[in-house]
Amino acid sequence: MTDPLYVFDGHNDLPWAMRELCGYELDQADLLAGEPRLQTDLPRLRQGRVGAQFWSVYVPCRLVGDSAVTATLEQIDFVKRLVARYDDRLSLATTAADVDLAVESGRVASLLGMEGGHSIGGSLGTLRMMYELGVRYMTLTHNENVPWADSATDEPILGGLSDFGRGVVREMNRLGMFVDLSHVSPDVMRDALETTVAPVVFSHSCAKALCDSDRNVPDDVLADMARGGGVCMVTFVPMFVHQGVADWYAECLDVTEGRGGDRRRFSDVDPVLAERMQTHPPPACTVDDVADHAEHVREVAGVDHVGLGGDYDGATFFPERMGDVSSYPLLLDTLRGRGWSDTELTRLAHGNVLRAMREVELVSRTRAAG
């Protein structure tokens, strides 16, 4: 029987975490019984009522060109092997109808999302082949600019999208792939919204009005996104949720840079985070802080345009009592306590992103027919 309040989450970094932990060797991590070294495993997905998951096939920005493409293919290969290993628990999905079928069968619909335009190596042909392999969203940038789009966390070069970047958006519309605007600069957000003819997603972002982080979404963009049918999937990462943690994280980035590191790269920043967690810990972040963002997006964009994108296994720490993928019911219960109806919670949990996915598919079919 389908869980009426199952979660369709927009972003989970288990593939890269498995690469780092054990070189993708499924026998070296116990995802079936429970894997305490990770924030994601099969028992906790079930506890968290996760019925559909966009698995991020992220690769670091230090990989460019063919190296980025190869690493992305390895990430895709891992997800497909993961699903094949646990095919009684997981099911590959490339359409909204596939998601429905997986959920009805009691399996987690498993979708692929690329995180950063560097994964296509500047090639529309590569973008098309990634679609053929099952990728259904691409985040236009990660933490660094690509030649055709500015990142939110890099020095702006283009002031938005280049002509090629607009062509990428149009090709994604034609293919039936979500344009994901997490990580991009506000100018890229606005250019993409001006260009797209299909709904966009923010796969893991929060509201800039509540937490002034470069990674978050301004209110005017939230409103424009909603007019086009898009969905902002609220993330749980404390430095994007809580202003005090965002300020603490900015200090960590300054320390990283002061030591000669690159503030855009996790490999340089993470050791500083680990050190300062011990010596100068961040303020507490709670489920109520996350709920505030869900409510703000609902207020600005509307209840039909908010979703969830936890970013588990993609961040070093999470709000109190929200440390892994079993935590979604806590957030849903918190929002219910604030007066959200079951209908509104269902839209937040999965209904909105499924509706947007169907609209993206319809745009693709319409353009193909034309």
Task: For the regions a language model picked out, list residue spans one by one.
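N-terminal hydrophobic targeting/anchoring segments and the immediately downstream early-domain regions
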Residues: M1-L161, D212-G370
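Histidine-centered catalytic micro-motifs
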Residues: V7-L14, V184, F202-C206
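Extended hydrophobic secondary-structure segments
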Residues: A17-M18, M172-A192, D304-A315
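Distinct, well-ordered alpha-helical segments
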Residues: A97, S123-L127, D187-A198
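Active-site glycine-rich loop that binds ribose-phosphate moieties when present
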Residues: G159-M172
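Substrate-binding cleft of carbohydrate-active enzyme catalytic domains
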Residues: R170-L181, V188, D219-R227, H296
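Acidic, glycine-rich loop-and-beta core segments that form the ion-binding/anion-interacting portion
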Residues: P186, E194-G229
